């Protein structure tokens, strides 16, 4: 498996359940160890310089495991403290993102009282707080309502327009086809096709190509 995600790119990662998407993403952010190969972020190895790498990235898992005993605002301040975000910057960013996701009135409530969608919104806000260069997300649209999904897509493109990069897995092929600059298809931990959307799908739909590749490699 060899991928190169460049600044300015939204890179989609697709495959059926159990294909290895989550394992790959967890290895990329330093959660899971690996025996061979190397993962570098902005020229630094996640194995030899994990802290330097983690300062430049944000990770949203498929089921965000938040500190439910905290309130939303306490959790966001906790994350901001970890990344050294100044008081002025965090206040402005929290105010902005919470307003976008209509979460402002809920930040004082304990996270334990949040719905799945609200937790997902909070995780997204937390990920964007320190202005990461790379955001890695596992099925980020699951649980989001249409408005929040639209907002997230805009934030992803905005980050890339500012020189960042996005790497995310999804089962929603229509979203990947419309949103991604590049896409990689994985099966059994092995890359079976990657490239720009035009290179991967040609004149067909991404769904059609994905299903054909699945059949060919069975």
Label the predicted regions.
Residues 37-48, 52-53:
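Conserved ABC transporter NBD signature motif
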Residues 77, 81, 88-106:
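Conserved ABC ATPase "signature" region
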Residues 110-114:
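Conserved ABC ATPase signature
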Residues 135-139:
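Catalytic Walker B motif of ABC-type/P-loop ATPase nucleotide-binding domains
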Residues 149-162:
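Helical segment within the ABC ATPase nucleotide-binding domain
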Residues 194-195:
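ABC ATPase "signature
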């Amino acid at each position: 498996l060899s991928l190169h995600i460049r600044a300015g790119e939204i890179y989609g990662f697709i495959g059926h359940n159990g294909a290895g998407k989550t394992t790959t993403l967890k290895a990329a952010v330093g959660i899971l160890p690996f025996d061979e190969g190397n993962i570098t972020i902005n020229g630094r190895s996640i194995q030899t310089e994990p802290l330097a790498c983690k300062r430049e990235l944000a990770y949203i898992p498929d089921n965000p495991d938040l500190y439910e005993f905290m309130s939303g605002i306490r959790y966001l301040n906790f994350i901001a403290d970890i990344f050294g975000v100044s008081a002025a910057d965090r206040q402005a960013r929290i105010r902005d993102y919470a307003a976008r996701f209509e979460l402002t009135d809920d930040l004082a409530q304990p996270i334990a009282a949040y719905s799945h969608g609200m937790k997902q919104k909070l995780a997204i806000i937390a990920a964007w707080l320190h202005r990461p260069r790379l955001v890695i997300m596992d099925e980020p649209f699951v649980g989001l309502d249409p408005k929040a999904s639209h907002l997230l897509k805009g934030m992803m493109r905005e980050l890339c327009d500012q020189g960042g990069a996005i790497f995310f897995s999804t089962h929603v092929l229509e979203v990947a086809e419309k949103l991604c600059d590049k896409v990689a298809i994985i099966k059994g931990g092995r890359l079976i096709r990657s490239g720009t959307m035009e290179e991967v799908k040609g004149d067909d739909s991404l769904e059609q190509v994905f299903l054909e590749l699945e059949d060919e490699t069975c």
